[in-house]
Amino acid sequence: MIVRMWHGRVPAGKAAQYRTFLNARAIPDYRSVAGNEAVYILERHDGDVTHFITMTFWHDEAAIRAFAGDDLTRAKYYAEDKEFLLEFEPRVVHYEAVGSVADSAPQ
């Protein structure tokens, strides 16, 4: 399984709106792609900036390609992101999941 990680920063005053957007728009988009196994959105407040990380779990590179296109590590953005993000990081990072244990998904 491949874990795809993206990082973005928003002004702290827009964090709640961006969280709502990610849950309403981005998560359903990820989940609509065959081979997407899970999505987690992480959030960390740091003064006047809030950091978001999306961790998406994919069956294989073919599934990522169906979502992101042929350039597998190129970040994918939505038109609405321009209302929130402080910059547009061009790349994501992929990791191979090599171990796990979970009783249930975080709520």
Model-predicted regions and their roles:
Residues 2, 37-50, 76-107:
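Glycine-rich beta-strand-turn "strand-cap" elements at beta-sheet edges
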Residues 2-9, 38-70:
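Short, well-ordered beta-strand segments in beta-rich or mixed alpha/beta enzyme
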Residues 4-36:
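N-terminal first-folded block
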Residues 12, 60, 96-99:
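Non-catalytic surface loops within mature trypsin-like serine protease
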Residues 16, 62-64, 100:
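Residue-level signal for secondary-structure boundary sites
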Residues 24-36, 57-94:
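An amphipathic, aromatic/His-enriched active-site/gating alpha helix that lines ligand/cofactor pockets
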